[in-house]
A protein has these predicted regions:
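An aromatic- and histidine-rich active-site surface loop
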Residues: 17, 83-98, 108-139, 143-145
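Membrane-proximal helix-turn-helix segments that form the acceptor-binding/catalytic region
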Residues: 118, 125-130, 155-175
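Carbohydrate-associated surface elements
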Residues: 40, 181, 198-201, 287
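Nucleotide-activated donor-binding/catalytic signature segment of Leloir-type glycosyltransferases, i.e.
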Residues: 260, 267-294, 302
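Acidic donor-binding loop of glycosyltransferase active sites
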Residues: 173, 297-309
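Conserved donor-binding/catalytic core segment of Leloir-type glycosyltransferases
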Residues: 214-235, 240-245, 258
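N-terminal subdomain of nucleotide-sugar transferases
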Residues: 1-60
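Acidic anion/phosphate-binding donor-loop and adjacent secondary structure
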Residues: 187, 201-217, 221, 236
Length: 309
């Protein structure tokens, strides 16, 4: 790959906490010239990160990667309307930012596809206009991901969502899936595309036990169930509220839920906990750097991971 020039399209990028930042740094370390077309950092809270606003900065560099930022409507408040506007605004503004890349000839386009699938639009348009191959790493499969957070039962709307989503996937020369099961689904959607499976990775630090005496002392004497990650509608965290209700009814105070992280559904989850009067069964630790997480995993008696069906 040395000497290749790659255009990466991803709505989210550094300083937001997404794996694409590491992937691009890896491309650059391998000798590629990497440009990223992305949005402005405001995920997950919907507030601009320090040093950013709608007007920019629109051009930066980080870890050997050149960053071109397009405007987007921030997710402020994480209401359904604001999330919808955020979803729509990035692909539109990014499309109009493609002329900024004029004269920067690329050998390939790489799209890091998170929600929504519409964020692929600038990648598809650039790849077709300039006749360069498009590779899409599918993180959120649409429309299935949409249905996991928004129950759409109208058959006509489901048909439209499926048609639009599948159209985007079929525009890629290569699709990268996170698992064999997802690869099988993509094979049915886009049979002509080349496909490969690249599982999500984690840092080596997660394999180590890290004992933090102060942390372990805070949660001593209880069975601690730890969730560490993104608090979003796709994660079935309300299930823990139901568990807490049952524990309360049984007068069981020896089980405790520790939530490490942040996300668009945190406020709603805290409100549900308050409404159920089970706040004593929960501790919210907020966002932590990845280097802190092994200590929480070591302290935990059980880890929680669940997705909405």
């Amino acid at each position: 790959m040395k000497g290749k020039r790659i255009l990466v399209v991803s709505q989210h990028y550094w300083p937001e906490n997404f794996r694409i930042t590491d992937i691009c740094a890896g491309f650059a370390a391998d000798g590629c010239e990497v440009d990223v077309l992305c949005g402005l950092p405001n995920y997950p809270k919907g507030e601009w990160f320090e040093g950013y606003r709608y007007t920019g900065p629109r051009r930066e560099s980080h870890a050997g990667v050149q960053i071109f930022r397009a405007g987007e409507i921030r997710r402020r408040g994480n209401t359904s309307l604001r999330i919808f506007l955020n979803y729509i605004s990035f692909p539109v503004t990014a499309l109009f930012n493609l002329p900024r890349l004029h004269g920067r000839k690329y050998d390939a386009v790489f799209c890091y596809e998170t929600s929504p699938v519409l964020m692929m639009l600038p990648a598809v348009v650039y790849a077709k206009l300039h006749r360069v191959p498009l590779t899409t790493y599918v993180l959120d499969l649409w429309p299935e991901n949409l249905y996991s957070v928004m129950p759409v039962r109208n058959k006509a709307l489901r048909a439209v969502a499926a048609g639009v989503s599948h159209w985007f996937y079929r525009r890629s020369e290569r699709l990268v899936a996170m698992s064999p099961a997802l690869d099988e689904r993509l094979a049915a959607i886009a049979p002509r595309a080349q496909r490969t499976v690249v599982p999500q990775y984690c840092e080596d630090l997660y394999a180590q036990d890290v004992h933090d005496a102060a942390l372990e002392s805070r949660f001593a004497g209880r069975f601690n169930v730890v969730f560490a990650g993104n608090i979003s509608p796709a994660q079935n965290l309300p299930l823990l509220v139901e568990c807490a209700r049952r524990l309360k009814a049984a007068d069981r105070r020896d089980v405790h839920f520790v939530i490490v992280g942040d996300g668009m559904s945190r406020d709603a989850l805290e409100q549900e906990i308050a409404a159920a009067d089970v706040a004593d069964w929960f501790t919210f630790e907020g966002q932590h750097p990845v280097t802190d997480i092994p200590a929480y995993h070591t302290m935990a008696d059980a880890l929680f991971a669940a997705l909405n069906a």
